[in-house]
Amino acid sequence: MKKTYHLCWSGGEEILFRSRRDYIHGIICLYIAAYESGSLLLAYCLMSNHVHICVRTENKKAFIKAFRYSYTRYFNSRYHRKGRIGERNFFSIEICGLYHLLATISYILRNPVHHGVCETPFGYEFSSARAAFKNEMGYALGASPASKKKHHNQIPDRHKLPPHVLMDREGLILPESIIDTADLEHQYSSVRAYQYYMNKISAEEWERRQAEDKNGKPPIRLEDIEKGIKGANMKEMLANMTSRAHHKMIGDMEL
């Protein structure tokens, strides 16, 4: 039986994604791990030194192990190194209840805003924020999808992507082709609710709504999502949600 989890893999003292190519390959590895384990991705966000994932899976350890192993092989080959990259363990929370799920996904997709690398979740390229309600929000498909054959050298050995997976011309997987968007849109129920959660300031109201799940679980808070991330500053992250728009924000790779 599949259960829903928030999983977080931290780089610790290391940078997991040093370049645009690393992010692109990381998303490929993430999806292959989900596809081959029969897991369903609900949300993801790759930051320079950590990864947040919301996934429905029967075996969270097998899923995250496959993802890390595949990406580590790529990373070690690209940067001529050996051994493990990032923290040995990963952080996980089992998600039970609608409002716990909405809070979890919203925190994951808002992560770049919390870290001050973009002004809205929809402005960050290496997350799945723009996968849901694309038509309602007026988003085009994005860059014209390219044939996967053009990017076969980026796909890990012995793996094949199914026909429905689309890439842009750089090989970046389009999130709407790998996220369970039907489930995600059902959970949020409307584009207005989705936008509300993507932009609402983190507050006690979220905790009160989660209590309505009546599952005996404590509310999901920002500090829970960021637990284990080295250097995470809760006050600063919350301040980034309430500050005035930044005309020039530092990018994640620059950071």
What role is predicted for each listed range?
Residues 49-57:
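Short beta-strand->loop micro-motif that forms the acidic, two-metal-ion catalytic signature
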Residues 1-43, 57-255:
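Short Pro-Cys-Gly-centered "Cys-loop" motif that presents a nucleophilic cysteine in a tight turn
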